[in-house]
Amino acid sequence: VETIESEGCEAVLPGLMWFVYNCLSAGDYNYKTFGTDKWSRHVKKAFRALLMQYQKPVTTALRKSTRFEVPTPITELMADAQRIVQLGNQAGEGWYLVGEMVDMIREGVPNIAVVQPFACLPNHVTGRGIFREIRRQFPQANVVSVDYDPGASQVNQLNRIKLMAATARDRNVSEERDAGQAVRPEPDEEIPTSPPTASRPDLNGKPVMELSVHL
C-alpha cells in the first residue's frame, strides 16, 4: 500500500468480511451441482444472514456519507463472477476474486494488483487464468500479478507495481486529453475550467488513480 501511495495513487483494498461471505455463499450451488449436505447450506445461509444483520448499521451509515461508498452485496459479486467463471471455481479465492475484479472495474478502479503469496498455488492458477478474459471484456483493465515467494526479488516486485502505476498515469492523462478534445465549444460558449476525467477527484480536487490489492 505504501508503494502504491508513494506513486501518487489511491489504494483500494477489498473488505475482509466479504471474504467470509465468500465462504458462506456457494452452499446452494454446491448442493445442486455437487450434491453436498443440504443442512450445511442452510447453516451457511443462516450464518451469513446473521453477519449481515450486524453489518447493517455500518451499511446504513455509509449510505448517508458523501465520502465513502457502500460495498457491493456478495450476491451481486456472484452474478459478476458468472460472466467469466462458474461458482464451482472455488480453488483459492476462485469466483470471489473474479467477481471482485469485475466489480472494481465497473466502479472505476481498472488498475488491479493481484498480490499473492507463494503458498497459495490455487490462486496462481485462478488469478492468472482469468486475466485474459478480464482484459477482453474490459479493455481498460490494467491488471498485474505480484507474487511473493522466497525466490522472488523485491526489486522485481516493486518494479511491477511501479510499471502498473505508470501505465495508469499515462492512461489517465490520455483520457483527460481526449475528453478535452471531444467537446469543442462554440465561440460564445463558456469553456469549462477543467475537463471531466475518469478518475475520482480527491479532497483537493486533483484527480487520483485507484488501485486494488488482492491478498
Spans of features found by a protein language model:
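An N-terminal assembly and electron-transfer interface module characteristic of large anaerobic redox
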Residues: V1-L215
